[in-house]
Amino acid sequence: MKFVGAHVSASGGVDNAPLNAMAIGAKAFAVFAKNQRQWVAKPLEEKTIEAFKKNLETAGILPKHVLPHDSYLINLGHPEEEKLEKSRAAFIDELERCNQLGLDKLNFHPGSHLVKIPKKDPEYHEKLMEAELHCLDVIAESMNLAIEATKGSDVKLVIENTAGQGTNLGYKFEHLAHLIEKVEDKSRVGVCLDTCHTFTAGYDLRTREAYDETMDAFERIVGFEYLMGMHINDSKPKLGSRVDRHASLGQGEIGWDAFCFIMNDPRMDDIPLILETIDESLWPEEIKALYALVKK
């Protein structure tokens, strides 16, 4: 069975998120655990935690179908020590917030190496590979430190694949596999596949053959046992453009066939499938449209 929803607002308090999800007919949702544009937030109050859990029950949504997202400020691979420490502390705080809310996942973008290498440098590819590998190791170290700091918790660190825009890592399945390999406690790690990011990173999804090829590569390199959520987005940019711009379903370069393949793929059962499409007013329709694709 599929559990589709969207990244809903936590305006007025995170406890409102389940009700916002219910209002659009969602069976899953994503939410920012705290304000995504601030480093520090006041601790969660007990009444907020209780209200969140109560509203989750009211909405009929299970904690495992909630996919919280961390702050966009966090870069677990930051090359500057001070900013890296700040990112690590904020990430640990968000893991603790998820645990307080009774949730078992925290979705995050791996990080960016921020190294500027001129394209015309004759050693461009060697220097790029070196910068990426070093950054991946720093991210893995950040993950291990975060897991160690939250030992009593079972919140999983869910790595999101990226479009590879700028110096963002996570645009190759090999990046995800590298991080998983370096994480000591593999019971605390997972992956979220974003369809727009997958497509603009160069993995096609538009035909049956292309979809199967991409998912076979994911299984071979990462493994479906690590898939803990998906972001369901169409893409404004073309295949392999390495640009991250979401589009409403059927209004981008990916098209409906790919979403039909996902909705009929048993490997995507029982995980949150989250819309992050650009027009929130279409979310109720998009959720219905996705369920309508399921072949009886």
From Swiss-Prot:
Domain of life according to the entry: Bacteria
Binding-site residues for Zn(2+) 1, renumbered to this chain: H69, H109, E160
Substrates-to-products reaction catalysed: Endonucleolytic cleavage to 5'-phosphooligonucleotide end-products
Alphabetical UniProt keywords: DNA damage, DNA repair, Endonuclease, Hydrolase, Metal-binding, Nuclease, Zinc
Gene Ontology molecular function: deoxyribonuclease IV (phage-T4-induced) activity; DNA binding; DNA-(apurinic or apyrimidinic site) endonuclease activity; phosphoric diester hydrolase activity; zinc ion binding
Gene Ontology annotations of biological process type: base-excision repair
Binding site for Zn(2+) 3: H197, D244, H246
Keyword Zinc attributed: yes
CDD domains: AP2Ec
Enzyme class (EC, first level): hydrolase
Cofactor(s) needed by this chain: Zn(2+)
Binding, Zn(2+) 2: E160, D194, H231, E276
Keyword Chaperone in record: no
Gene3D superfamilies, sorted: Divalent-metal-dependent TIM barrel enzymes
Described purpose of this protein according to its UniProt entry: Endonuclease IV plays a role in DNA repair. It cleaves phosphodiester bonds at apurinic or apyrimidinic (AP) sites, generating a 3'-hydroxyl group and a 5'-terminal sugar phosphate.
HAMAP family: Nfo (MF_00152)
Assigned protein family: Belongs to the AP endonuclease 2 family.
Protein name: Probable endonuclease 4
Native source species: Sulfurovum sp. (strain NBC37-1)
